[in-house]
Amino acid sequence: MAKKVVAVIKLAIQAGKANPAPPIGPALGQHGVNIMMFCKEYNARTADQVGMVVPVEISVYEDRSFTFVLKTPPASVLIQKAAGIEKGSGEPNKKKVGSITRAQLREIAEKKMPDLNANDIEAAMRIIEGTARNMGVTITD
């Protein structure tokens, strides 16, 4: 018989830097999950993406066991890294903070494809382009 899911927890954690301190500890602790086991597994599976924020969806079962699915890093983080900026613009319609090329845009869209609600790479590129525009990042050819 399949195990019954009692909770689904969504967190965005720095890759390779999960520790039992808040926000991870309290979020998992209230469901009785072994926090250290989660931290070790998460850090091992994200060791190749250090420096990125990697969202994770944790399913907690009745017997306090858990499974988790890693998502792709947020588009905004990927855009910031590509443009070499610290953060997006406070007023994107007036002040531009950086720019990325179409090739970089395509690369980000390909990386985000599994988590985007898009059927082809062109649609994914339009979604990422919108995110970039809202951050004050211009797209150059």
From Swiss-Prot:
- Keyword Ribosomal protein, does the record have it? yes
Consult the record and explain the modifications the protein receives after translation: One or more lysine residues are methylated.
Q: What superkingdom heads the lineage?
A: Bacteria
- GO function terms (MF aspect): large ribosomal subunit rRNA binding; structural constituent of ribosome
Pfam families assigned to the protein according to its UniProt record, in alphabetical order: Ribosomal_L11, Ribosomal_L11_N
Which NCBIfam families does the record associate with it? L11_bact
Name of the protein = Large ribosomal subunit protein uL11
